[in-house]
Amino acid sequence: GTRYLDGNISAAGEQKGVDIIAAIREAVGPDVEVLIDAHALYNVPTAIRLANRLAPYNITWFEEPVPPESYHALRQVREQVPTRICVGERLHTRFDFVPVLEQRLADFIMPDVTWTGGISELKKISTMAEAYYVPVSPHDASGPINVMAGAHVMMTVPNFYKLETMRSKLSAYDAFITEPLVCIDGNLQVPRTPGLGIEMNVEYLRAYAVPEFSGPV
C-alpha cells in the first residue's frame, strides 16, 4: 500500500495490479466474486482508467476509487466506468450518505459501525439505503466488536449484502475474546447471549496495551 500523494500510480504498478487480478480471475473461475479496494488513493482520471482496465475481469465492485471529500469526483468516476462502485467506510453519520443515495453515486455502501455513529446510526443508514434498493456491506477495520456489532444490525436489514472482515481468517481475533467467533460455510453465527454475544479477553488486552495510546483497561 501507499499514501495518497498525487493520486497517480506508476505504469509498472498499474500493470502489475491488472496482471494480479487477471491471474486471480483465471484461478477462481467466473463464479467467485472479486472485490477491489482502491482505498481512496486515486485522482479521477487514474480511477477511471483503472476501473476500465479491471472491468473485463468482472469485478464485483471497485471500492473507494477516489478520496471521500468530493462527491463531484465520485460522480465523474461513476459516469465513466462500467464497474460497480462501493463507498462509505469514511463517511460519518447518515447525513453523509444522503448525496450518495440521492444521486446514485454507488451501487453498494459500506458504513463502519464504529466510525459512523454506532449501532443505531448504522441501522438508520441501512434503512435509508433500503429505500433506494442499495445493498449494505458493513466495513471492518477494528476487530471482533466491530464485526459482531455489524452482524447484529445486519440481522435486521433486508438489503444486507456481505459482512466484511479485515482478516482472512476470523480465528485471528480469537486471542482478543473469551470464545471464538464461529463461521460455518462462510456464514458468521450470531450468538444468542445478551449484548453483542462476545466477551473481551481483558487480561490479554492488558498485557499488550500501549500506555501512550490507551486508557484504563
Predicted regions and their residues:
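Shared catalytic-loop signature of beta/alpha-barrel
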Residues: 52, 58, 67-187, 191
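Structural signal for hydrophobic packing residues in well-ordered secondary-structure cores
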Residues: 25-28, 58, 154-158, 209-212
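C-terminal extensions of enzymes
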Residues: 177-217
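Metal-dependent enolase-superfamily TIM-barrel catalytic cores that perform enediolate-based chemistry
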Residues: 1-75, 80
